[in-house]
Amino acid sequence: MFQDNPLLAQLKQQIHDSKEQVEGVVKSTDKAYGFLECDKKTYFIAPPSMKKVMHGDKIKATIEKQGDKEQAEPEALIEPMLTRFIAKVRFNKDKKLQVLVDHPSINQPIGAQQAKSVKEELQEGDWVVANLKTHPLRDDRFFYATINQLICRADDELAPWWVTLARHEQSRYPVRGAEPYEMLDQKTRENLTALHFVTIDSESTMDMDDALYIEPIAQNSTQTGWKLVVAIADPTAYIALDSQIEQEAKQRCFTNYLPGFNIPMLPRELSDELCSLIANETRPALVCYIETDLTGNITAKPHFVSAYVQSKAKLAYNKVSDYLEQADNAWQPEMPETAQQIHWLHQFTKARIQWRKTHSLFFKEKPDYAFVLAENGKVQEIKAEYRRIANQIVEEAMIIANICAAQFLHEQAKTGIFNTHSGFDKKFLENAHNFLMANLANEQNQTELAERYSVENLATLNGYCQMRHDIEPIESDYLELRLRRYLTFAEFKSELAPHFGLGLEGYATWTSPIRKYSDMVNHRLIKAVLAKQPYEKPQNDVLARLQEARRQNRLVERDIADWLYCRYLADKVASNAEFEAEVQDVMRAGLRVQLLENGASLFIPAATLHNNKEEIQLNPDELALYIKGERTYKIGDMVKVKLTEVKEATRSIVGEILQ
């Protein structure tokens, strides 16, 4: 009698409409229930309802009330957590194909079918790319996926590389070449092959894109300064704007440097052979003449030329550093001219380091961590590598060359691709001011610092540099690490703007055109100005792609490293391995620390820090944890930790602090 009763249907609709409706994101737990996190409140989701949703789904829900208890009932899908995703193949007990999503918070198997384009026979544990086809909240059907690509087999030792590249939709292959290569601009080059250029790089480097030559400037037999000549490989000599290689480089934007190997932006026969500044081979180059006084000030406008150059020696960072540091049994240069170049470059570098410490910003020394891999991809060891004097020689030469390129492009071309950084995010300037005052001000200097660190002052390049110089001598990294969270991101722009991170008025990279697309663009602009040819301002879509590619490459490198750290540390749990570490992040859930010996990131759950979670408070302004009202841990603290658990499946490394 009540079937199809319009009054009853209307009543049901009214009851439904009267219920509170919310939007939020689903958070799963390791139990069958979950939660819906909304802007101001979190609601319980019961186990039957959790079967309709997945961790990370953005949904609409109605709130059901029973007494003083509230729970969310999922109603509609706004945005699914999964569209394209990485997974492992699984067969259930009925031999039905399923996929297990590669995500630490999603553990339900999803039924799947193989796309016709995937010809391989899939096996348990294989890594695949899949797409979610049906979702219970959207399609009134259970979760179901299509497998579109086999990434690699379950037992592939290089899975961390292939899976991560697939996740970020990056190619594992170099760009295809286009033999034969013809030089497009031969006529306008000067012959500089007589100059004694040298390259300084890692021993294994093949894609050498910079060579250096230096000589003193003298007046009346007294040295007054330096003339540095920076020669940079010229791949645009071989690459036409309308070529396939150009289009691929424009999409990739960077050579991808991964643990163990790289994936070049250009075909290897260009990056490692034709364009690489190989010793005793004549190569096309874009060359910049730079003049400074003895204290490192630039004293003349930079002078650019297209040229042919010939590196006279391929030198290695460690050997040159050993030689300059006069280490026992150190390598010795083969030619006196090479020795002379090394010593002059060393003197120039010391002057430029001092100049940057005074006039711009100089970075605190932090090591790079290098994975030493066996043939099969197994991690043999992880080395902390510090920048030594030979690395600094190249770094200072490249920095001054990029300062000069920014000046040249701004004045001559009125455009370019500039590396910019505007310091503190405008919305955090007040926070930065308050934080500096809370940590550095006292009764004596209160008035002076209030002006020195005023919001207006911190927003200027000079004010920002002044503040950084003030905190530089402080031994702890706490101030620097906390202030870093208030900074904005670096950006590529087509007009000159300051780079607060470097403390410079302008910066435009052109010294790595084999490895960076932005540098290729700047090469073309510089060469167009020199040849008095027309040129175009770099398009916004190119700048946006550079930004996105840089972000992607960093994620790829980090994800592979996290996986390799798990493999490396897994067998060290049983031995209760202990490490010195620095606190990198402070959250309600616990601490994230970095192991100083190898760079691995470790999570310390709050439950291991104190047995009563009600007595643990997070101070988000200080990035500090308070226990029983006392500040106990803050970002930048040095702690001793031990490993307690490594899970390769979720790439998580867990530890605890040794009191």
UniProtKB/Swiss-Prot annotation:
Any single biological process term in GO: mRNA catabolic process
Reactions the enzyme catalyzes: Exonucleolytic cleavage in the 3'- to 5'-direction to yield nucleoside 5'-phosphates
Signal peptide: none
GO CC aspect terms: cytosol
All copies of domain S1 motif, residue ranges: 576-658
Keyword set includes Nuclease: yes
EC id: 3.1.13.1
Record keywords, A-Z: Cytoplasm, Exonuclease, Hydrolase, Nuclease, RNA-binding
Domain of life of the native organism: Bacteria
Database matches in SMART domains: CSP, RNB, S1
Keyword NADP: no
Pfam families, per the entry: OB_RNB, RNB, S1
Residue ranges annotated for the RNB domain, each copy included: 189-531
UniProt enzyme class: hydrolase
GO MF annotations, alphabetized: exoribonuclease II activity; RNA binding
Subcellular location: Cytoplasm
Main location: cytoplasm
Family the entry assigns: Belongs to the RNR ribonuclease family. RNase II subfamily.
Function: Involved in mRNA degradation. Hydrolyzes single-stranded polyribonucleotides processively in the 3' to 5' direction.
NCBIfam families assigned: 3_prime_RNase, PRK05054.1, RNase_B
Protein name listed in UniProt: Exoribonuclease 2
Organism expressing this protein natively: Haemophilus influenzae (strain ATCC 51907 / DSM 11121 / KW20 / Rd)
